[in-house]
């Protein structure tokens, strides 16, 4: 796991996240140092503090679950990383849509997916500009003003489709309670998806068991009667149990594991 520290004339503080130290002590990101691989921070009673190497550094292999779930999204490195993960999905998503922005609505779930969603939308805007330039080059701009207006109106339709009523994470709920819980977590916004016409693209920043998706979210979204639903996840696949004591010990429960099995059938 990561470890960060800050030192001044009065304190030595260590925390797993840079943003927590920044908030508590109101310091700049560059004032907070990350403990290097194989290193230890030694604080002596004399007040002398130093970072020393105690083990040979090995290849850096960050825990994806740490960065997806446990890390504060307001840390500058985590924020930009999550946004870039969303941006990487822009091209494959537009490919699935056939570059049709007019009949597509974009949204996200849960609230923590907003950062990745912004990255996705930024990436789609970049593609949109190229599509507009290409379309304009193929028409008589001076004599087709309405067509020009239509082309320039192309933009991703961003809407807040899912609303979370209660702050809860179903993946850390006991198996016996999870099924009852997932049906009461989200509600939807009506009147923004055109029935049987619009494709609905939903960005998720993490899929663990997929319980909430399968038993609640997809069923709720289906009430809006979209032509189809495309679910995209910005997070790396979670294939193995996490080591920090969360109840997720069975590999067969993971959505990524189940999907891999289905692909092999």
Predicted regions: what they are:
Residues 1, 42-43, 222-224, 228-231, ...:
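Intrinsic structural disorder
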Residues 1-193, 200:
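N-terminal segments that mediate ammonia production and transfer
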Residues 26-27, 55, 127, 216, ...:
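Alpha-helix boundary/interfacial micro-motifs
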Residues 49, 194, 229, 262-264:
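Short flexible/disordered coil segments
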Residues 177-254:
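PRPP/pyrophosphate-binding module of the type I phosphoribosyltransferase fold
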Residues 253-265:
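Extended, composition-driven regions rather than compact fold-specific motifs
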């Amino acid at each position: 796991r990561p470890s960060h520290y800050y030192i001044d004339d009065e304190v030595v503080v260590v925390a797993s996240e840079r943003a927590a130290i920044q908030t508590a002590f109101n310091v700049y990101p560059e004032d907070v140092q990350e403990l290097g691989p194989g290193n230890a921070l030694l604080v002596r009673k004399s007040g002398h503090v130093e970072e020393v190497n105690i083990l040979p550094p090995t290849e850096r292999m960050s825990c994806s679950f740490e960065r997806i779930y446990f890390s504060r999204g307001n840390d500058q490195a985590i924020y930009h990383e999550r946004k870039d993960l969303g941006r990487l999905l822009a091209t494959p998503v537009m490919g699935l849509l056939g570059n049709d922005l007019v009949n597509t609505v974009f949204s996200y779930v849960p609230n923590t997916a907003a950062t990745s969603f912004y990255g996705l939308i930024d990436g789609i805007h970049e593609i949109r500009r190229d599509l507009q330039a290409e379309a304009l080059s193929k028409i008589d701009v001076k004599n087709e003003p309405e067509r020009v207006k239509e082309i320039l109106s192309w933009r991703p339709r961003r809407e807040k489709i899912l609303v979370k009523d209660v702050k809860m994470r179903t993946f850390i709920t006991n198996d016996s309670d999870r099924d009852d819980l997932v049906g009461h977590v989200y509600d939807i916004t009506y009147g923004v998806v055109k029935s049987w016409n619009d494709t609905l693209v939903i960005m998720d920043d993490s899929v663990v068991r997929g319980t909430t998706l399968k038993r609640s979210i997809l069923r709720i979204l289906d009430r809006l009667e979209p032509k189809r639903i495309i679910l995209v996840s910005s997070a790396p696949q979670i294939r193995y149990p996490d080591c920090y004591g969360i109840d997720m010990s069975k590999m067969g429960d993971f959505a990524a594991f189940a999907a891999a099995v289905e692909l092999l059938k």
